[in-house]
Amino acid sequence: MLCALLVLLIAGVSAFLRLSKAGLGCEPWPSCFGEALRALQRGAAVDDNAVQTVALARLAHRLLASTALVLALLLALGHCTAKPLHKGRAALALGLVATALFLAGLGLLTANSRLPAVALGNLLGGFAMLAVSWRLAAPERPGDAAPRAAALWALVACGLVVIQVALGGLVSASHASLSCADSLDCLRQAARQGWPWPTLNPWREPAYDVASALPINPAGALAQALHRVGAIVASLAVLVVAWLLHRQAERRAAATLVLLLSLQLAAG
């Protein structure tokens, strides 16, 4: 449980760093959005550590990530040497260590990268660590397997949530927040552009419309549209899982899912 809470804290600090770098909440808004990226693309030097809050957050992120790696190693050691050996949990613990090492290497090798793929790697890796560490913290309940329909819907919902997380990360890392105003506007712009699927390539550096007075990435409309539509589809799948849990008398789990979904929709 400690590792799961620590990973959740790391995810929060990482999100703060990512959104601060993008310029969300900057002044004067919205003309300041993406100023760091635009300065780098002009060849100017940018030191976001000059902002004390960002510098402290980056230091906290490194300390927390190092602590999480140590905890993951201890978890793996404990599960791999346990008697009797639980192969499933040992494999999960080793996967947790592998993911932590991957994220550590990604951070070292891509510290100044402007590619959305790097942000997606950090985001999805962090969520994977959170899911695995939470699963390791959950108590075993033998003989309490979920019915086939509930298990299938849970798998579908998890897949949709992962896709939704990736699309949200792509919108953020592509500086697409100002690409369109609402769902209909995003769909109209994406249709007007001929549904440009190559713009979803995370290995493309974001580019701004030089003719616009605002820092708008016109290629971000499709990602925005998919993210908004995906939110509806993923929410419906999660609600189906919550309903199935409620029918199985798992009312606490069902209520937790609905609460988390409500908080996410309110935040979005």
State where each predicted segment sits.
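Polytopic transmembrane helical bundles with strong interfacial aromatic enrichment
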Residues: 1-268
